[in-house]
Design a protein with these regions (language model features):
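Blade-level signature of beta-propeller repeat domains, shared across WD40, Kelch, NHL, RCC1
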Residues: 372-409
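Hydrophobic beta-strand positions that form the internal "hydrophobic ladder"
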Residues: 56, 94-95, 139-140, 224-225, ...
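Surface loop/turn motifs at the tips and blade-to-blade linkers of beta-strand repeat domains
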Residues: 34-39, 77-80, 121-126, 204-210, ...
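Asp-box/WD-like beta-propeller blade repeats and closely related beta-sheet repeat scaffolds
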Residues: 81-84, 88-92, 97-190, 203-206
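Conserved blade-ending motifs and adjacent loop-strand segments that build the rim/top face
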Residues: 300-313, 347-380
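Short, conserved, GDST-rich strand-edge loop motifs in beta-rich repeat architectures
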Residues: 99-100, 142-186, 228-236, 277-284, ...
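Blade/loop signatures of beta-propeller domains
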Residues: 13-31, 180-190, 350-351
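Beta-strand-rich domains and repeat architectures in extracellular enzymes and scaffolds
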Residues: 18, 29-62, 215
Length: 409
């Protein structure tokens, strides 16, 4: 009996992924950040880092944990079913929601990642979710479907429960069908802000039959909110911004070609640049990381090739580099360096600035099941790119060093 337990333990130990390695195809060092099978870094545009850059929150099968990025020591910070929102830009508070016994209701909480102090902030309205916190941590923002309207079970307002298995199945195989079903239902929605001190809710949009989703506050301007008209990208003008007083509801990119798609948008660290992927047309060979500065109106389009494509891209804190998580056609974690083409005395005003991306492969992801999207993000010191992966079976969070460990792999 003792021998069988010992052999089982040895097999489990042997199956554990390496703590670090140098990718033989790229020469870059990869570090496994998390030890728990089923642990994931955050979605690519959710901030998971404390303002001092020393800690990172991540999800586990039993809640949310916090990782010391200097020592790689981790500890649970939220136990049980919970859905993270973001780590604050001003404090070390992590904001999250918890489900209740009723599948259409949830509660809003915060926990300090340094002290562990926890506070319930509010009971949310029926079918409501909060998905972003503003720069000075005074407001949250979210949406809910009004009344009892539904789309036959397709994205129609039940509360996310949090992941409870070692292997994240990722996106559903029939995601496209479900999204088309939900978009066609045209369910009336409300977009709101919630005061994090008082719990008071303020309506921004009401009775809106667009599918309102992916809310993101500017990381610098506490009154500026980005959101999207969700749905298959070729069917919607997706990316919008609005002020917290309900004014300046502005479309950021309008489609001009059949099957043109724009999406997977995110804020630059400056809090005034909106980045997004742009494809002319869907399934074609012309793609860009595009950006729009909400203060100056400047647009920049950086072209990339199909063999540089990613599900998600992201930008470095200083705005000088980009990264991508690859896809089934190009299974790599990428580093991108932008090249802006000089203006050859172009005549005209308000023209788009053009350029292209030079890519460097950082991690071979051929063993990745891309139903789990890696969701890359730069660490605050810009020395690493964090991503999630199931290349060893269960999910773990990893980091790849931007600088090469081996210059001649």
């Amino acid at each position: 009996m003792l021998l069988s337990f010992t052999l089982a333990g040895l097999r489990a130990l042997a199956a554990e992924p390496p703590a670090s390695w140098v990718d033989p195809d790229t020469g870059h060092r990869v570090i496994r950040l998390t030890r728990e099978p089923g642990s994931d870094s955050f979605y690519f545009n959710y901030n998971g880092f404390t303002p001092d850059g020393k800690k990172m929150a991540y999800t586990t099968t039993n809640g949310i944990s916090v990782l010391n990025l200097e020592t790689l020591e981790a500890k649970p910070i939220v136990t049980g079913r919970a859905r993270p929102i973001v780590v604050g830009r001003k404090t070390s508070n992590l904001y999250y929601t918890r489900p209740t016994d009723n599948p259409f209701f949830s509660t809003l909480w915060r926990v300090n990642l340094d002290t562990g102090e926890t506070r319930k902030l509010a009971d949310l309205p029926c079918r409501a979710g909060v998905s972003t916190i503003n720069a000075d941590e005074t407001l949250g923002a979210g949406t809910f479907i009004e009344g009892d309207a539904n789309a036959g079970g397709a994205y129609d307002g039940t509360v996310p429960l949090g992941k409870m298995t070692d292997v994240n199945l990722g996106e559903p195989e029939n995601k496209g069908e479900m999204m088309a079903q939900r978009l066609a239902a045209a369910l009336p929605m409300t977009m709101f802000t919630i005061n994090l001190q008082t719990g008071k809710i303020k309506t921004l949009l009401q009775h809106n039959t667009n599918w309102l989703n992916h809310l993101q506050f500017s990381p610098a301007d506490p009154t500026l909110l980005m959101y999207c008209h969700e749905g298959s990208w070729q069917m919607v003008d997706r990316i919008w911004t609005i002020r917290t007083d309900g004014s300046h509801n502005q479309l950021i990119h309008k489609r001009s070609m059949e099957n043109e798609i724009a999406g997977h948008e995110w804020w630059g660290a400056d809090g005034e640049t909106v980045f997004y992927q742009l494809h002319f047309p869907r399934g074609g060979h012309v793609s860009f990381i595009a950006s729009y500065n909400v203060k100056t109106g400047q647009r920049v389009w950086l072209q990339y090739n199909p063999d540089q494509s990613s599900i998600h891209d992201n930008s470095s804190p200083d705005g000088k580099l980009y990264c991508g998580d690859g896809d089934n056609r190009s299974p790599w974690i990428f580093l991108f360096r932008p090249v802006i083409l000089p203006n050859q005395r172009t005549l005209g005003r308000n023209l788009i600035k053009g350029g292209y991306l030079e890519s460097e492969k950082l991690v071979n992801m051929t063993k990745q099941n891309y139903r789990l999207e890696p969701n890359p993000s730069f660490t605050p010191d810009m020395k690493y790119i964090v991503f999630r992966s199931n290349m060893f079976g269960p999910d773990y969070a990893f980091a790849v060093e931007v600088a090469k460990a081996n210059p001649t792999p």
